[in-house]
Amino acid sequence: MTRVKRGNVARKRRNKILKLAKGFRGSHSTLFRTANQQVMKALRSAYRDRKKKKRDFRRLWITRINAASRQHGLSYSQLIGNLKKADIQLNRKMLAQLAVLDPASFGKVAELASQAKG
């Protein structure tokens, strides 16, 4: 068999991992084996939490909308149901922004929703 010289390839592979581990504490940023484990764990967590972030924000928006709609005498589910009946197409992010930044406008939207009950 012929000899395969892989010194450069191996060093590049290790340096790539160590570069990703920059800023980790202790040996996690200097020793290849522990750095490799921590980088894999960090990438797994980052992937998982990108998905979780979407769920977390939706929960936050719903909580804010619920709190604001109860001030106008509607529960969250009633508000959303009535908005659908009235064909008002505001998503939860927009409604939450209105509730926080412009409560008067949110009040108008809630009023329209309560009129659409029937």
UniProtKB/Swiss-Prot annotation:
It comes from the Bacteria. The keyword rRNA-binding applies. One of its GO terms (biological process) is translation. GO terms for molecular function: rRNA binding; structural constituent of ribosome. Transmembrane segments: none annotated. Keywords: Ribonucleoprotein, Ribosomal protein, RNA-binding, rRNA-binding. GO terms for cellular component: ribonucleoprotein complex; ribosome. Gene3D superfamilies: 6.10.160.10, Ribosomal protein L20. PANTHER family: 39S RIBOSOMAL PROTEIN L20. Binds directly to 23S ribosomal RNA and is necessary for the in vitro assembly process of the 50S ribosomal subunit. It is not involved in the protein synthesizing functions of that subunit. Belongs to the bacterial ribosomal protein bL20 family. This is Large ribosomal subunit protein bL20. It comes from Nostoc punctiforme (strain ATCC 29133 / PCC 73102). The gene is rplT.
